[in-house]
Swiss-Prot record:
Pathway: Amino-acid biosynthesis; L-tryptophan biosynthesis; L-tryptophan from chorismate: step 5/5. The alpha subunit is responsible for the aldol cleavage of indoleglycerol phosphate to indole and glyceraldehyde 3-phosphate. One of its GO terms (molecular function) is tryptophan synthase activity. The lineage of its organism: Archaea, Methanobacteriati, Methanobacteriota, Thermococci, Thermococcales. Keywords: Amino-acid biosynthesis, Aromatic amino acid biosynthesis, Lyase, Tryptophan biosynthesis. It comes from Thermococcus kodakarensis (strain ATCC BAA-918 / JCM 12380 / KOD1). This is Tryptophan synthase alpha chain. It is an enzyme of class 4 (lyase). It catalyses: (1S,2R)-1-C-(indol-3-yl)glycerol 3-phosphate + L-serine = D-glyceraldehyde 3-phosphate + L-tryptophan + H2O. Tetramer of two alpha and two beta chains.
Length: 251
């Protein structure tokens, strides 16, 4: 789904508006190997404070699930950069698995990651995704046993998303050595490409994770924080993503 060395920016759909989200997507797509577009949810338990607040802002502004597909359809008029939708299972369940995935595919999504759907309960989802031609992405944590990691790798048709830290998302100044140990372990086990996220905020971290064996690096909270405090978020976002991706692709 993406080239080795790619930066993968995460954006929350609808924060602060549908129109701004489209502007953000167009600002970063030139420098992104793939984009994660998060679907706002009222209880984003896996996310840290920064991304949680972005979900809440979008929902307070009246954001609806259909707005995600509307943003993506408009984005597809301008760009072919791969996009995966990142969601919790509740919106998928409420919509219906087949209907949700059908709308995602029709709007231009390339894949989907359901944060709180374990592989062991993903049978219907996997069948429907295969039918629609959508790539599937599953999460693995540092404490995921090797055998479980093999199961996740087998179920993933897009890439495996490695959580570099225990706990929720959020930018950190430094990543612990356990994050790099996990990447090296997963590299020996997984056949899929590996994307690493949670806690990444600086280009030095991107470089370190790629050297450890990651194929792509996800940056989310640092970008959402920039958007929330900037007076010129489109230009600052573009500059930040260009900086991070340029550093990663120079390896």
């Amino acid at each position: 789904m993406f080239e080795k060395g790619s930066l993968i920016p995460y954006l929350t759909a609808g924060d602060p508006s549908v129109e701004k989200t489209l502007e953000f997507l167009l600002a970063v797509e030139e420098f992104a190997g793939l984009i994660e577009l998060g679907i706002p949810f009222s209880d984003p338990m896996a996310d840290g404070k920064t991304i949680q607040e972005s979900h809440y802002r979008a929902l307070r502004n009246g954001f609806k699930l259909d707005d995600t597909f509307r943003i993506l359809r408009e984005f597809r008029r301008h760009s072919s950069t791969p996009v995966i939708l990142m969601t919790y299972y509740n919106p998928v369940f409420r919509t219906g698995v087949k209907k949700f995935l059908g709308e995602a595919k029709a709007s231009g999504a390339d894949g989907i990651l359901v944060v709180d759907l374990p592989v062991s309960h993903a049978g219907e989802f996997l069948d429907a995704a295969k039918e629609e031609g959508l790539k599937t992405v599953f999460l693995a944590a540092p404490n995921t046993p090797d055998e479980r990691l093999r199961e996740i790798d087998k179920a993933s048709t897009g890439f495996v998303y490695l959580i570099s830290l225990y706990g929720t998302t959020g930018a950190r100044d430094r990543l612990p050595e356990t994050a790099f140990e996990f990447v090296r372990r997963a590299r020996k086990i997984c056949n899929n490409k590996l994307a690493v996220g949670f806690g990444v905020s600086r280009r030095e971290q991107v470089e370190e994770l790629l050297k450890a064996g990651a194929d792509g690096v996800v940056v989310g909270s640092a970008l959402i924080e920039l958007i929330s405090r900037s007076e010129n978020p489109v230009e600052e976002l573009r500059r930040k993503v260009a900086e991070l991706s340029g550093y990663s692709r120079a390896l």
